[in-house]
């Protein structure tokens, strides 16, 4: 669902903003490489986390996307940086779409932040079958 939604939104001119995390974030960024994606990071922009997304992170930076962070260069991600990253994701976004989220997840922090910033996240009761 994340791949399809990101591809379709990108083709309509929207830039996909996500956190370069495993799963849904990875699928969303990969689907939007050709149309525009921004990776908000919990580490310095030169420290791609998780390591398994190194190639994707490099592609984002090389292919016209953007990696951004409030953390200084060289800084590894720390637990306190993830809510800050989620605030950036929400702040850059016209709408926040949560495709899948655990009860205690960054996705729900991002959705709550969007509400605090005056935006209503779109909701669906569809069950995604895969990222």
What are these language model-derived features?
Residues 1-131:
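Glycine-biased, small-residue-rich flexible motifs in mid-sequence functional cores and linkers
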């Amino acid at each position: 669902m994340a791949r399809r939604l990101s591809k379709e939104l990108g083709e309509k001119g929207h830039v996909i903003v996500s956190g370069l995390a495993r799963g849904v974030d990875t699928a969303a960024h990969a689907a939007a490489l050709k149309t525009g994606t921004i990776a908000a990071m919990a580490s310095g922009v030169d420290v791609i986390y998780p390591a398994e997304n190194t190639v994707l992170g490099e592609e984002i930076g090389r292919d016209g996307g953007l990696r951004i962070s409030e953390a200084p260069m060289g800084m590894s991600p720390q637990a306190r940086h993830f809510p800050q990253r989620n605030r950036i994701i929400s702040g850059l976004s016209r709408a926040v779409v949560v495709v899948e989220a655990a009860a205690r997840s960054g996705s729900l922090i991002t959705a709550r932040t969007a509400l605090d910033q005056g935006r209503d996240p779109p909701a669906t009761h569809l069950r995604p079958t895969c990222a």
